[in-house]
Structures are given as C-alpha cells and as structure tokens.
C-alpha cells in the first residue's frame, strides 16, 4: 500500500477518515487517502494565509528559483511519476511518460521562464509615465481532475506561486498519487511552509470548503460542466477571481481531399488518447458523403486493431478507464446509442484479458 497524506504547513498529516484508491486496471486497492473535512481545509487555508506575506514579499527572481528547484527534483523522479500515473489512472505508461511526466516538469520550467517578462509594464505619455504593477491575488484554491493529474496540478500551482500567491490545492480523489509525490518534492527542496498545501478528499466536502472559504481569493477549477456551474454559483457572489476549464464536445471534419492513410491514425489518436478521457479529444467524426464508405471501412479497421491491455506494457495502445463507475457510464451511452438506432461498427464491449486485468475497468475503443 502506498502512503498518501495531506501536506499542510510543511508537514504531512493524516485525517480521521480515509478513501480507498483503486487501481482501475486490476481492481486492487493501492492506497487509503485522506478524506479531508472542513476543519482539515481550514488548517490548510490558515497555513497559506500565514505564509502569504513573506512569500509575496520575495522578488520574482527569488520565487523563480524555487520553481526551477521543483522542476529539477521532479525530473529526477520522472519514471516514478509515469509509473504512479499509470497505476492510478489506468493509462498506458508510454503515454504517462510522454505527456504526464514530461509536461508536469515542463510546466514549472515554462512559468519560471515566462515570469521573467511579467512584472511591470510602463506606458509613456506626453506629461506622465504610467506604470502597471502586478500584485499577488492572495490564496489560490486549485481543484484538479483525474485525467491528467500532475500535468494539470502543476499547470495551476506553478503560475500561482511564481506570481507570489500561496496555494490550497485539492487533486481528484480518484488519482491522488502524483499529487502526493509533488508534496514530497516540495518538502524535499525546502519550499517555505504554507506556500503550497495539498488536501485530499471529496469534491462536495473538501472542494466545496475551498471554494466557499472567505479567505480564498481565487478559484481555478478543471472538471465537469455541472460541477463547474456549482463552483461558479458559490464563487461569483463572493467576487472571487474564477477560472473554469470544463467539458468539451469536439468534432473532426473529414473532407473529400483527405489523405486517408495519414489522417486516420491521427484522428484515432485524437479520439482515443487517454482512453478518450480528455476534454480536447474528438468525440465525433463528420465525413463527406463522397468518401463515407471508404473512410469508414479504413477507420473502423484501424480502431479495431488498437491494442487494449496491460497499462505497464509499451505494446498497449489503450489502458483501463479511470474507474468502474466511469466505465459503467460510458457503456450506458453506448447502449443509449443502440436504442436510438445507432450501429456499433466496432468495440462497445469489454475485452477478454488475462489475470489480473480481467478484473479491470477496460473497454474496447468504440
């Protein structure tokens, strides 16, 4: 079992209640994570508030150095990041290496570099010089999803802290392992206590407490549209700064002059990357009627030959869906399509896999 704890005020702490973290590829329990309640979040907000004055008083150059330290420490553990991400999400490890690990590291480096030119702006006028000076907002409440756990957590934390804000972050309870690794890295490099606080738990408990807390000045949420609406309804009357990245429904348009042999692998990748669990993925293909038959035959054949299986194998194109509940939801939409007259040309069923993956949340690309 992997140990996962909250990271508050520079210390790893447990909670009274826990949540099981399940490996979706095998159904095995891999960790028991904190189920943070309002008092646990309150401690994290207090720590962030206490650290705010000192952290914001540092120069951009000083804060930038900390981002570079974090990036270097993450890079030293890049293979561990990929392994944990694959274990937690069910995605193929080759994808976790190429995207999750590499881009999480790159996020800290990018925002360290970006901040060099993001301090002051000066506008000369005939009789005056106007200056725009950027100041920290305060405490940033950051809530991230399960599909790209560390990638999106680092995408939020890095710009928040380099600009002088302190952070209370809540990763998805489905995929907490790399957030815990990030806390270990932050502790290892010696980032001042309270600058980054990470609490685990459920959205309607820990997440809602972060969003509604009067001392949290900014909310950045990535997740479902329905939840995003609730976040906005809570944050807007409090005049919090609010950033929402929500669901997508994307079309791929295929015209007559398409080079099919080049396009089909890319269209399949855009639709099934990360088992299709990315808001940027193409969820439907609109095809010119002139090439419908030829394109459909080739595309279905390509998708039908994509390999579903062991996420730790470099031979697997697709791994497991993130949870059994999510697989059930996807299957319900497939059944709905059939009831409404749709024809399943490939996939739509659970693959036959050897133990222990026969107990996992796998589904053929459909």
Residue ranges and their predicted role:
Residues 1-32, 65, 69, 118-143, ...:
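Terminal low-complexity tails and localization/encapsulation signals of metabolic enzymes
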Residues 10, 27, 63, 85, ...:
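Residue-level signal for inorganic ion chemistry
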Residues 30-118:
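Glycine-rich loop-to-alpha-helix module at the N-terminal edge of alpha/beta enzyme cores
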Residues 39, 76, 80, 91, ...:
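Short alpha-helical
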Residues 218, 226-364:
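ALDH superfamily catalytic-core signature
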């Amino acid at each position: 079992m992997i140990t996962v704890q909250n990271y508050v005020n520079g210390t790893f702490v447990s909670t009274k209640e826990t949540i099981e973290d399940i490996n979706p590829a095998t159904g095995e329990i891999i960790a028991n994570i904190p189920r943070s309640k309002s008092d646990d979040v309150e401690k994290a907000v207090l720590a962030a508030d206490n650290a705010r004055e000192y952290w914001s008083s540092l120069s951009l150059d000083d804060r930038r150095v900390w981002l570079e330290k974090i990036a270097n420490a993450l890079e030293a553990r890049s293979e561990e990041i990929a392994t944990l991400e694959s274990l937690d999400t069910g995605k193929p490890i080759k994808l976790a290496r190429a995207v999750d690990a590499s881009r999480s590291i790159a996020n800290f480096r990018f925002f360290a570099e970006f901040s060099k030119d993001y301090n002051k702006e000066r506008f000369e006028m005939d009789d005056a010089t106007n200056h725009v000076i950027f100041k920290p907002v305060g405490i940033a409440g950051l809530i991230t999803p399960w599909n790209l756990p560390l990638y999106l957590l680092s995408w939020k934390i890095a710009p928040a802290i380099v600009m002088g804000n302190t952070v209370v972050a809540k990763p998805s309870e489905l995929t907490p392992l790399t957030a815990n690794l990030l806390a270990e890295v932050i502790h290892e490099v010696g980032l001042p206590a309270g600058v980054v606080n990470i609490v685990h738990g459920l959205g309607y408990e820990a997440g809602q407490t972060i969003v509604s807390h009067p001392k949290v000045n900014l909310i950045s949420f990535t997740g479902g549209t329905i939840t995003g609406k609730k976040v906005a309804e809570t944050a807007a009357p409090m005049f919090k700064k609010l950033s929402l990245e929500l669901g997508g429904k994307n079309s791929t348009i295929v015209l007559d002059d398409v080079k099919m042999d080049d396009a089909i692998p890319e269209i399949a990748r855009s639709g099934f990357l990360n088992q299709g669990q990315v808001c940027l993925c193409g969820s439907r293909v609109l095809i010119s009627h002139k090439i419908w038959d030829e394109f459909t035959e080739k595309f279905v054949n390509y998708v039908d030959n994509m390999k579903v299986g062991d996420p730790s194998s470099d031979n697997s194109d697709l791994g497991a869906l993130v949870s059994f509940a999510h697989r059930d939801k996807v299957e319900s939409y497939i059944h709905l399509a059939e009831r409404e007259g749709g024809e399943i040309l490939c996939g739509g069923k659970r693959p036959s896999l050897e133990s222990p993956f026969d107990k996992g949340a796998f589904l053929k690309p459909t």
